[in-house]
């Protein structure tokens, strides 16, 4: 009973924050500010910190599988929320289709960025020590590099050679997209609670996991910007993530739900009670105005 009371208090506070109009309106601006000024933290952070190593537990377990973690927790929350209200598998699948669309967009960006990197970059092999002693170094004292043709970035890096070219940070893109997606999908929980919707412990626990995951993604984004600054690749990646969110949640999903549009989060969950449904959609609309 005591733990359940704590769970209720924490989730109510988190739902109030995520459903707040000011938070919804300015959260993407917060991420933009992090992308712009986060690299400046590299002037003060310690490079001997555990977060300065790419092999850190959080990077290996969460960042490399970021989209998977997001789908697991957000998908579970969306399904339980929608199914507990309407008991309609069709409605639940319609709301889950937003994750499928975002996942397809993420995979498409990965393929496109891979093609861009391979088309604009080149692979270089450092000359051996003996050959460097014979040929010398370049004018700046840097070791000579031998250009290797017809090499992709993946095979080049795997062979221990150097890859130089134009890049867009996939990590920044993924983290920004996941943060904005989490904020959108969980924001409906506040209006849902205000309307007296069923909120048992399993649903609140899933919501709490989503909030913790959102906090973790923001923290990892800050760590990447502070300990591994890569300007402007991270800025470009974050911009793509924000543009993807705006195109989906501020554009396409605002259309009326149909076979070609899954609709906004929370729409149709309480349509069996027309007055409550109208109130929920009105509150959701007001909080999504940018």
UniProtKB/Swiss-Prot annotation:
One matching Pfam family: FIT
HAMAP family: FITM1, FITM2
Name under which the protein is recorded: Fat storage-inducing transmembrane protein 1
GO BP term (any one): lipid droplet organization
Main function: May play an important role in the formation of lipid droplets (LDs) which are storage organelles at the center of lipid and energy homeostasis. May directly bind to diacylglycerol (DAGs) and triacylglycerol.
Gene: fitm1l
Record's keyword terms, sorted: Endoplasmic reticulum, Membrane, Transmembrane, Transmembrane helix
Annotated Gene Ontology cellular component terms: endoplasmic reticulum membrane
Membrane-crossing residue ranges in chain numbering: 1-21, 26-46, 65-85, 173-193, 205-225
GO molecular function: coenzyme A diphosphatase activity; diacylglycerol binding; triglyceride binding
Compartments where located: Endoplasmic reticulum membrane
Domain of life: Eukaryota
Membrane topology recorded in Swiss-Prot or TrEMBL: Multi-pass membrane protein
Family, per entry: Belongs to the FIT family. FIT1 subfamily.
